[in-house]
Amino acid sequence: DLEQYFGILKDRKGLKGVQINDAISGRYYQKEAIQAVCDAIGERNRRKALLVMATGSGKTRTVISLADVLIRHGWVKNLLFLADRNALVTQAKRAFHNELPNLSLCDLTNSKEDANARAVFSTYQTMMNCIDAMRNEEGGRLFTPGHFDLIVVDEAHRSIYNKYKDIFTYFDALLVGLTATPKDEMDKNTYEIFELEVGVP
């Protein structure tokens, strides 16, 4: 884990004024969201971000584009996408495959797929089970605390965090939450999870 971490640190590029792939996320508000997360990570050393975007505004495309930027700038090698239902996991994996076809992908809910992929898609429950159960060739844990550099949480809200907080505390990774819940309707604990001032994602 440390070797991988120091390798990533050495290869990192600044995130100020990043080039965003318009083919993935061309809408101005998607670009603003990506740059805001990049600024928070790169300039303010934040490790958590929350994207509040209305249904149909392209949350998945925005996070794919964010992942693309972070990968190209050396901040992310492996990422984990978590959702609460299999259908959302499948949907997200398909979207990543369409936009980033060279990125190796794995749906953990499908046992036939290679869990050594750079982008892993899973339900929360499946990942909880896999942390202890999945082993590498040497017999150690496949998913060590430093395995992922970025965790994306689909529909981030307090009930998910309360139920599966062990996932978020186990992995030492950047955490990006996605939600369509309007800022003024969001539980204040959701802001606390992402270490944000209430009402200011």
Annotate each predicted stretch with a short phrase.
Residues 84, 155, 180:
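Conserved H-loop
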Residues 1-78, 83, 87-102, 116-119, ...:
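ATP-dependent helicase/translocase motor core
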Residues 158-201:
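Post-DEXD/H (motif II) to motif III coupling segment of the RecA-like Helicase ATP-binding lobe
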Residues 92, 130-134, 155-166:
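Conserved ATPase-coupling elements of RecA-like P-loop NTPase cores
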Residues 103-108, 176:
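Acidic/polar loop patches that form or flank catalytic/metal-binding clefts of enzymes
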Residues 108-120:
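Conserved motor-coupling elements within RecA-like helicase/translocase cores
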Residues 123, 154-155:
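Walker B catalytic acidic pair
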